[in-house]
């Protein structure tokens, strides 16, 4: 009894079937064994061609079409608004400077938008304190600023930070006095703090290295006199406000004058001429103050003429 046969037929049977086919007039009579041989031969051929197919996956045996380059997702830069959200302050500023340099026609438009913004006094003070700290951090590590005897080497290292601070201070002061700011109390308070920041800056042993400090204090003296002139002309402030407010400013100004070797003497005298006691006293003090202001303006003009005739530093922020 023959069982289930797997694979090829034995060679003897294949030979017998071949002989029998030759004896029947060269007519090939297919047998079951030949059919199975073809089927198994085709299966072996498929098994040999299977590893050659590069598109067959290693795991799972599922073929995959090679992706074309056009169907791949390509990276792209951020949109303009999304990129601007990630930019910091320095990058914004550099971008604006580069744009205004390449396109000068947009400078006026940018300036108009900037001056239309309302910056708080506290924000200005925070910026000034940061720039003041930069001055202290630029002091050489082997020198102490408390002695106020910094040498020439320290001046060379600190000069860029000093000029940046003083330039920023002057710009902020001019933006916070009349007519830009009508609140005289806020203007005086801001000027008071700015004067204190300048007075406390470390000074140098050589007097010529303190030129920028002294020049700045002279300009602050002119601003003090200008604000006192506005106060003298405003009768409501003279009569309604508490005299202790003005005395507080005068006391602090006196301390600043002592530390600046008398450079703030003129506004101090103008403050002392104010009398808040009565309307008649206020009126008389206003007249005497106006006479002092006329003398102040004449003195300021003479000093400016002397400064223009002499040689001054080209990088001074106050020339």
Curated annotation (Swiss-Prot):
It is found in: Cytoplasm; Nucleus. Gene3D superfamilies: Tethering factor for nuclear proteasome Cut8/Sts1 (1.20.58.1590). The keyword Transcription regulation does not apply. Involved in ubiquitin-mediated protein degradation. Regulatory factor in the ubiquitin/proteasome pathway that controls the turnover of proteasome substrates. Targets proteasomes to the nucleus and facilitates the degradation of nuclear proteins. Residues 34-74 are annotated as: Disordered. This is Tethering factor for nuclear proteasome STS1. Belongs to the cut8/STS1 family. GO terms for molecular function: proteasome binding. GO terms for cellular component: cytoplasm; nuclear membrane. Keywords: Cytoplasm, Nucleus, Protein transport, Transport. Its main location: cytoplasm. One of its GO terms (biological process) is protein transport. Binds the proteasome. Interacts with karyopherin SRP1 and Proteasome subunit RPN11. The keyword Electron transport does not apply. Transmembrane segments: none annotated. It comes from Saccharomyces cerevisiae (strain YJM789) (Baker's yeast).
